[in-house]
């Protein structure tokens, strides 16, 4: 039980450091950009798969 309390304490410290510094804002911007890129790639793959099935 002591082990898990120490693990959660360390996780809370890391989350606090990332949350209270500017690192969180920078990573959020990167995550938004990556989300849009992968969303576009997903839509393209669905459209390309639809065209491929129509040929068979």
Curated annotation (Swiss-Prot):
InterPro entries, alphabetized: DUF1328
Any matching Pfam family: DUF1328
Membrane topology annotation: Multi-pass membrane protein
Residues that span the membrane, as ranges: 6-26, 30-50
Location(s) in or outside the cell: Cell membrane
Top-level taxon: Bacteria
GO CC list: plasma membrane
Main location per the UniProt record: membrane
Annotated keywords: Cell membrane, Membrane, Transmembrane, Transmembrane helix
Sequence similarity: Belongs to the UPF0391 family.
Annotated HAMAP family: UPF0391
Name of protein: UPF0391 membrane protein HCH_04387
Species this chain originates from: Hahella chejuensis (strain KCTC 2396)
